[in-house]
């Protein structure tokens, strides 16, 4: 994916937020007594504060096999739990890229996997095999860009993901062998164990410097990253 700076993140924030922004319907004039006193509107609920994890859970956020994007030694670690077949994860990909663009020296993004959709496990195996060839980021981007080709709701077909990986430069014969190795099966089991311990039930889920982002939204993610970056700069 190619992104174009600050204009892109404004577009992403607006488009993602629009999905949850609903105006209350205006009732017909006859639905309320003419003299009824209308109650004051309920103020919007305040954002829920991020939840700081225990040291035991923080230790589960990152594993030696976890792919890392951005600054390898960044002061702010964003852990994203994603499902490559998840449409919301695809929608958040430009948001994550924008974080890396805005904080090139400070932010490192650690990727963890969930297989909540039928074709996801094979795609995760493919991504791990691609990581071993140094092609993780390229393949993840390609799988998101062409998600409808292999992860449609009506006819999911993970085998098509291999063609997408090949187009991204992966040696597919080598990757197929690596994807079916015992080590990858153990990796998938550990991913599942960690997600259960961390109580991850949706994708994407974000943790920033050991804090769970409770409220789901790009605005909240950017705010928490900015806050943590400010702390580490002091």
Feature roles, as predicted:
Residues 75-77, 104-108, 133-138, 170-172, ...:
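Loop/turn elements at helix/coil->beta-strand transitions in domains of secreted/extracellular proteins
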Residues 84-87, 114-119, 145-150, 181-184, ...:
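Solvent-exposed loop/turn segments at secondary-structure junctions
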Residues 76, 87-90, 117-121, 130-134, ...:
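Soluble non-cytosolic domains of exported or imported proteins
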Residues 13, 80-83, 200:
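Processing junctions and N-termini across compartments
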Residues 1-17:
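Sec-dependent bacterial lipoprotein signal peptides
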Residues 2-3, 20-34, 162-234:
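C-terminal cap of thioredoxin/glutaredoxin-like
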Residues 102-165:
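Structural microenvironment flanking redox-active thiols in thiol-disulfide oxidoreductases
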Residues 2, 19-118, 191-192, 230-234:
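Extracytoplasmic thiol/disulfide redox context detector
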């Amino acid at each position: 994916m190619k992104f174009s700076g600050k204009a892109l993140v404004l577009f992403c924030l607006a488009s993602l937020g629009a999905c949850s922004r609903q105006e209350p319907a205006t009732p017909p004039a006859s639905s309320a007594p003419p003299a009824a006193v209308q109650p004051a509107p309920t103020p919007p609920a305040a954002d829920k504060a991020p939840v700081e994890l225990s040291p035991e859970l923080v230790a589960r956020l990152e594993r030696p096999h976890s792919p890392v994007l951005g600054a390898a030694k960044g002061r702010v670690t964003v852990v994203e739990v994603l499902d490559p077949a998840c449409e919301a994860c695809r929608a958040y990909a430009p948001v994550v890229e924008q974080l890396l663009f805005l904080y090139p020296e400070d932010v490192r993004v650690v990727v963890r996997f969930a297989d909540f959709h039928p074709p996801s496990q094979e795609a995760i195996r493919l991504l791990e095999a691609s990581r071993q060839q140094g092609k993780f980021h390229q393949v993840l981007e390609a799988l998101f860009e062409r998600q409808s080709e292999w992860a449609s709701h009506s006819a999911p077909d993970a085998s098509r993901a291999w063609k997408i990986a090949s187009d991204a430069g992966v040696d597919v014969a080598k990757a197929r062998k690596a994807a079916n190795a015992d080590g990858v099966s153990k990796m998938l089991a550990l991913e599942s164990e960690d997600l259960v311990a961390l109580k991850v039930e949706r994708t994407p889920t974000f943790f920033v410097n050991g804090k769970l982002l409770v409220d789901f939204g790009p605005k909240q993610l950017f705010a928490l990253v900015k806050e943590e970056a400010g702390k580490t700069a002091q």
